[in-house]
Amino acid sequence: METTATILHADLDAFYASVEQLLDPSLRGKPIAVGGGVVLAASYEARAFGVRGGMPGRKARELCPQLIFVGGNFSHYQRLGDAAIKVLDDFTPVVERISIDEAFADVAGCTHLFGQPRDIATAIRHRVRAELGLPISIGVARTKHLAKIASQVAKPDGLVVVDPGTELDFLHDLPVSLMWGVGPATKSRLAEIGIQTIGELARTHSGALTRLLGPAAGEKLAALAWNRDPRKLETRRRAHSAGAQSALGQKPAVARVIVPTLLHLADRVASRLRAKARPGRTVTVRVRFADLSAVTRSITLDQPISATTMLAEIAGDLVRGVLADHPREKTISLLAISVSHLEESAELQLDLPLGLADEKRRPGSKKGLARFGADRAIDKIRERFGKQAVGYGTVALEAARSVPDEFRELAEKEL
């Protein structure tokens, strides 16, 4: 680990809402939400009333009757997000962009040019505000995890530097919800055994965390609670997974909602896998319920897949398993699919026709090859005539369209 804090995490504050207030100054100081049927993003003024991203529009209006909904200016989001990252690039070549509105930067190699990390972070914030008119919060620390937490503590529109020697004092008084990987469901499970702060988590025996969260998550959180994070910045990341999600508002957990939504998600994910000739072996689904708690489930296959209907069916099995384990949950607010363990191969290994029950889900079987061929035909039509030229009937007729496709594409774009 470095002996000085040189890793920055820069995060544009309430980015989509801030852009809307920049484009229309009459919205400044007012509670606004980007979206309609589902809140895609909320300004800090709206968050003060409890409005959050992913929330149904109706509930958001109940919490904040004066809430102003705006449709979204997606080209401006991309332009301004790129411009903010360019400011970081002007100070250091070691930049890892992790989303449209946030990035890590390591300034260890440029302090002789621009001053100490605190000075560099201050200069970045001033330039983003002066050149783009947007607020940005920055955290500075020795590790990526701590820098990201520091930027959250700095919000809105602030700067927090965590110097070596003060790290655990800073970290251990903070709530566990600030940690990477702790969502509402994990936070709730930790609270059940009396863990509210990162310090309480750090002092919990690793065996208890493993039993509660599983070996991977338990060991990871235990290490992060002690600021043990050896990860380096990845400036030229190659995608290790592909995913898509759909915020549904509040929908009944029934087949007529789940099946078309999963097919729509599978279409978005699988088409990207085929375009990169990178099928994957591990399929993961995420189901978020009405109370915003979420459950994930995954399966690792014998062969990598990139066929749309095959992915949708496997995801459907996983989602049904989640719902079977949570029979009291009758409403879902989000579904997500991701494929990981990607491989560098466009070719399919042929299977012998053994009449196996899962033959249609085996990529190299006769039925599997037919499915892949149909997908490639769809890909070629879309390449020539556009994405809307052809699709799956179930998706076209039934899939919820509460989130604009432009927003989905922006969120899923490989940066």
UniProtKB/Swiss-Prot annotation:
Cofactor: Mg(2+)
One Pfam family hit: IMS
Gene3D superfamilies for this protein: 3.30.70.270, 3.40.1170.60, 5' to 3' exonuclease, C-terminal subdomain, DNA polymerase, Y-family, little finger domain
Main location group: cytoplasm
Binding site for Mg(2+): 11, 101
Transmembrane segments: none
Domain UmuC residue range list: 7-183
Keyword presence, Cytoplasm: yes
Keyword Protein transport among UniProt keywords: no
Function in brief: Poorly processive, error-prone DNA polymerase involved in untargeted mutagenesis. Copies undamaged DNA at stalled replication forks, which arise in vivo from mismatched or misaligned primer ends. These misaligned primers can be extended by PolIV. Exhibits no 3'-5' exonuclease (proofreading) activity. May be involved in translesional synthesis, in conjunction with the beta clamp from PolIII.
Database matches in PANTHER family: DNA POLYMERASE KAPPA, DNA REPAIR POLYMERASE UMUC / TRANSFERASE FAMILY MEMBER
NCBIfam families: PRK02406.1 (NF002677), PRK03858.1 (NF003015)
Protein name, UniProt field: DNA polymerase IV 2
The organism's taxonomic lineage, starting at the top: Bacteria, Pseudomonadati, Pseudomonadota, Alphaproteobacteria, Hyphomicrobiales
